[in-house]
Amino acid sequence: MPYQPANSGGTSGGSKAAAKMAQLKFWNKQNSSKQQQQDKDKDAADGGNNTSGGGTGSNSNGDAKSEAKNGKRNWLHTPEQLISGHAVYLVKFFGNLSVDQPKGIEVVKEAIRKLQFAQQMKKAETGTQEKFKKLEITISIKGVAIQEPRTHKILHQFPLYNISYCADEKGVKKFFSFIAKTVKTQDGSDPTSNGHANGNGDGSAKVEESHECFVFISNKLASDITLTIGQAFDLAYRKYMDSTEKTNLSKAQQQINHLQQTVNVYKERLREVSAKLPKAELDALLFNLGIKDILEAPTTEPQNGIEVASEALSNGKLDDDKLLIDTNSTTASTHSASPSSFLPIVPPRNNLSSQISIGGKSNSQKMDELLLNSDSDSDFDPRADETQEIGGTGRSAISNMFGFEPANSFGQHLFSNNNDHKLQNNNSSLLITSNNNSINSSGFSSELNITPPLLAPPPKIAAPRRLNSVTTGNGLNGNTDLFGSDPFELNNGPNIFKQNQLNLDDFSLESLDPLRK
């Protein structure tokens, strides 16, 4: 029940008004609490809480991840302020002590507990609360400095690359801390102001590196200080990357200029040396190298296979070294499968053997075959056109009126044996040539499979003069050998003449002429 003044009289109207006011206050308080809860939930969902740590090692990892995922950060200062100037915060220095680890929220909590315990011990000894010293923290992309507000005396100064962790304690909002690397000399002197030892230059003093945790108290700006240090780290990293790219570009340009100067010096020396050589030797050297000038150098620009092929076709010339198909290599199909080369499809290997055996002969082999099949005196046959195939085997029967076959010449013997062997073993030769290994050893198989050239057909084998079966009155067949199987055998011939079965008028001397048909 709200407080009522004494002069109100306790009227009913006053009591009703007081009750309504109390009810309105209760509703306003309840609505305000609901609105605050909704605002907190919204900030947690959006990840835009400005009190989250933005340093190198903030303990609010969830908020930092959500901000990085959204691709934006709620920085407190403009980039120009931290690049050209600095941000200053007034804080209370709680203390500092050495730590074992360079980062971690548990390391920071342990350091805060130790400092609090030390403060309680001093209070118990002296009986009075120690006052904390007020200091200024100056933050920029160059580093973090701790100085006195009035005298601006720098007590501690650390570059950003020496700060390994920065966080504000969420449990206790007023604590802010960071871990930095310090350098001390072995004789126990104070750490240097910039994190590096002030050596004498002789290298006699030994240094010792350690990590210290600095803790500060700020009732309202602890999270802002952490976020400002995080922004300084981000700007410093971007500046470092930009400067590194420019430095690398300048170094590359310097190297290019140095190489150009070196090439010019070498060209001048080469021109002087070539001037001392005889002109004949210089021309021979240029001809062997395929260049017109001694200072000419081949271009090293990469060209794809399509451009090379188009240039070759447009010029109408195709070098032997740039053949599209290499039939002498078994890796032709492998090269043709690569997408970088513009090569046609390789024909099947089973047909390649016949193509090689027919069309792949050298000029020397063709000339030898032409000379072998030429119409010489030994190969001349007046009855070359009288050929008849018997039994479909491709072999011609030769029968002379004297009963024996003349000896074949060297060319007839060669082509007759080759044709018989090829016709009888047609199927087997196709199976053998289908193997890829036989293609590789075609030097020996091609000599065995020699076929007659197209321009000089092989000489035809003479056919018998009398092909019709004629039976004489004496019972003799027209194809019968009148002199027997052997013309020089005396046992066959005289029997015929004794029986008077053959008269001299049956044939004349002109019929015995081998040049007449």
From Swiss-Prot:
Q: Where is the composition biased (Low complexity)?
A: 1-19
Null phenotype? Embryonic hemocytes display a reduced level of apoptotic cell phagocytosis. Larval hemocytes display reduced bacterial phagocytosis. RNAi-mediated knockdown in muscle leads to an increase in the number of ghost synaptic boutons but does not affect the deposition of presynaptic debris while RNAi-mediated knockdown in glia leads to a significant increase in presynaptic debris deposition but does not affect the number of ghost boutons.
- What GO terms fall under cellular component here? cytoplasm
Which segments constitute the PID domain?
83-265
- One Pfam assignment: PID
The PTM Phosphothreonine maps to: 480
**Which SMART domains does the protein's record reference?**
PTB (SM00462)
Keywords for the protein's UniProt record, in alphabetical order: Cytoplasm, Developmental protein, Phagocytosis, Phosphoprotein
Q: Which residues carry this modification: Phosphoserine?
A: 338, 374, 376, 378, 469
Q: Which SUPFAM superfamilies match?
A: PH domain-like (SSF50729)
Q: From start to end residue, where is composition biased (Polar residues)?
A: 185-197
Region Disordered, as annotated, extends over 1-70, 185-205, 374-393
Family annotation (PROSITE patterns): PID
Q: Where in the cell is it found?
A: Cytoplasm
- UniProt record, GO biological process: apoptotic cell clearance; mushroom body development; neuron remodeling
Family, per entry: Belongs to the ced-6 family.
What the protein does comes down to: Plays a role in axon pruning in larval mushroom body neurons during metamorphosis. Plays a role in the infiltration of glial cell processes into mushroom body lobes and the subsequent engulfment of degenerating axon branches. Involved in Drpr-mediated phagocytosis of apoptotic cells. Required for bacterial phagocytosis. During neuromuscular junction development, required for the clearance of pruned ghost boutons and presynaptic debris and for normal synaptic growth.
Q: How does it assemble?
A: May interact with Drpr.
Question: What's this protein's name?
Answer: PTB domain-containing adapter protein ced-6
Organism phylogeny? Eukaryota, Metazoa, Ecdysozoa, Arthropoda, Hexapoda
Q: What gene name is given for the protein in this entry?
A: ced-6
